[in-house]
Curated annotation (Swiss-Prot):
Enzyme class: transferase
Keyword Nucleotide-binding carried by entry: yes
Catalysed reactions, as listed in the record: UMP + ATP = UDP + ADP
Protein name per Swiss-Prot or TrEMBL: Uridylate kinase
Gene3D superfamilies from the UniProt entry: Acetylglutamate kinase-like
Compartments where located: Cytoplasm
InterPro entries listed in its UniProt record: AceGlu_kinase-like_sf, Asp/Glu/Uridylate_kinase, Uridylate_kinase, Uridylate_kinase_bac
Binding sites annotated in the UniProt record for UMP: G52, D72, T133, G134, N135, P136, F137, F138, T139, T140
GO BP annotations listed: 'de novo' CTP biosynthetic process; UDP biosynthetic process
Subunit: Homohexamer.
List of residues binding ATP: K10, L11, S12, G13, G53, R57, T160, Y166, D169
């Protein structure tokens, strides 16, 4: 029995690389599509936002001499590429999926609106919302917070390469311990890098809980949806 009726699933672009150094790993993409299909078959309405860091990151582009606005726009296009790839993988797995874009670019994807996204989800389609917020200077974490709030999701599931939030980076500090749950106030007080400050504050102010979990372990998405205590829950 699914704990949530409607979710916003946030995936990082880097996670799509799998074992590669760059781009999209077809095996990882197929694994993600299979996990998403599994919870879709339980009747969960699914909205997805994917980053673009496996292709281009706006902020690092600024450090390489690109104008920040142009760099962020290139990053937005990278999220569209990833969204199209995931959409194709979902369709190949037998699931209806639709890509909506924050900036008009028909026929690549339909222009995003809250009402279009909700209508598609209620009709059994998985909706992938690409292009960030459509504006520079906003991360895809902020874009996913915005979309999660707009589509009235019950929760944001932040699929990462680590199994939750720790007191410190577990790869650098062997004494780091994991939180099973933590409040937004505590996240902000400790300066924990769950998401950027704008995204975190948006979720806090709009009472959208986040579950940070390891998406790369097959079966974890279903466990989170079923209410199993894996990962870290962030709440008010």
């Amino acid at each position: 029995m699914a704990k949530y009726k409607r979710i916003l699933l946030k995936l990082s672009g880097e996670s799509l690389m799998g074992e590669k150094q760059y781009g999209i790993d077809e095996k990882r993409l197929a694994e993600y599509a299979a996990q998403i299909k599994e919870i879709h078959e339980q009747g969960v309405q699914i909205g997805i936002v994917i980053g673009g860091g496996n292709i281009f990151r706006g902020l690092s582009g600024a450090n390489k001499g690109f104008d920040r606005v142009k760099g962020d726009q290139m990053g937005m296009l990278a999220t569209v590429i990833n969204s199209l790839a995931l959409s194709s993988a979902l369709v190949a797995a037998g699931v209806k999926a639709r890509v909506l874009t924050a900036v008009r670019m028909e026929p690549i994807g339909e222009f995003y609106s809250k009402w279009k996204a909700i209508e598609c989800m209620e009709n059994g389609e998985i909706v992938i919302m690409s292009g960030g917020t459509g504006n520079p200077f906003f991360t895809t974490d902020t874009g996913s917070s915005l979309r999660g709030i707009e589509i009235e999701a019950d929760v944001m599931l932040k699929g990462t390469r680590v199994d939750g939030i720790y007191t410190a980076d577990p790869e650098k500090d062997p004494t780091a311990t994991k939180f099973s749950d933590i409040t937004y106030d505590e996240v902000l007080k400790r300066g924990l890098k769950v998401m950027d400050l704008t995204a975190t504050c948006m979720c806090k102010e709009n009472n959208l809980p986040i579950v940070v979990f390891d998406m790369d372990t097959v079966g974890n998405l279903k466990k989170v949806i079923s209410g199993e205590e894996i990962g870290t829950v962030v709440h008010n």
